[in-house]
Amino acid sequence: QASGVIIADTGQELLIMTERKVISGAKSIHVTFLDNSTVEAELKNYDGNTGIAILNVKRSDIEESTLGRIKVAVLGNSLQTTQGSVVLALGSPLGTNFSILTGNITSTSNSISTFDANYNVLTTDIVGSSQGSGVLVNLSGEVVGIVMQDYSSGDENTLTAISVSQLKDIIEKLSNGQDIPY
């Protein structure tokens, strides 16, 4: 179980970004929206290096009342996020769905290394869970970081997130069904 964020509405389907880890090996994938309606989703593509997965949900499978409440997230510029910036952790930062926590960015200078790249990490003072997932949102409502279980900090009590600005190209390619070359 993890959270996801709606990153695009193509008119035919909604694209939802989540962690591959939590759907890997699943026989079926179901998405639950804030109004507790649940629909089936399909894996569109994933990046094995970062662990990001893109799901698609057919708009025709979603009730009109639910569609009317859905908003597509704006992926912001996390490079403008500085130490002391106020952020909201949305999704399941405590490991339970529909959680919201607030706090500040404590560092923007840390990074993680994957097979082919280094990614900036946003460290916060938000007490969360090592099983947490979701996004960090700035006060303008833009996603600036992606909280992922595989990249939790050494201090398991505080949330860290990968800087979304460095992931935009990967997210776009996955959303278009393209594979990520290594």
Task: Outline where the language-model segments fall.
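Catalytic-histidine neighborhood of serine endopeptidases
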Residues: 9-52, 57-60
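A conserved glycine-rich beta-strand in the N-terminal activation segment of trypsin-fold
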Residues: 1-13, 37-40, 74, 100, ...
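Flexible, gly/ser-rich surface segments that form the specificity/activation loops bordering the active-site cleft
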Residues: 73-117, 151-159
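Active-site substrate-binding loop(s) of clan PA
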Residues: 6, 31-32, 42-44, 62-96, ...
